Amino acid sequence: MEEIKYIEPAALHDEMLRLRNEKQMDFLESLTGMDWGVADEGDAPNVTRGLGVVYHLESTVTGERIAIKTSTNNRETPEIPSVSDIWKAADFNEREVFDYYGIVFIGHPDMRRLYLRNDWVGHPMRKDNNPGERQIRYVWTMKRRMIRPGK
């Protein structure tokens, strides 16, 4: 079983760089966005809340694996440092998490939507997303072109 470690966003980039260099965690297996809900007074001290990310890292040298969790309780402007300068594979995944959860990755070279249209309002994987608040209108256009023999 792999170790699971929580890191505050402010220390994330430095700690990930340390894991890459000192622990030889050279392979980013996955990076997944999460919405653990709103923090509550009755939560146990070790319960993760807010919007965040889980990183699964592996060392191809030692075979060691670790999962890193980080989160922010700021639901209005959630920000987490980018690790795309450490693992290039994070580039695509961070854009996906931004698209679906609205988490902005500080330092990312191209932080824009990946799957959803630019005029899409909200982030569909968040627990506070209510698709009933807006009407989504799809407009499909199809151009027909008649091809006549001999022309």
Where do the model's predicted regions map?
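Terminal low-complexity/charged segments
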Residues: M1-K151
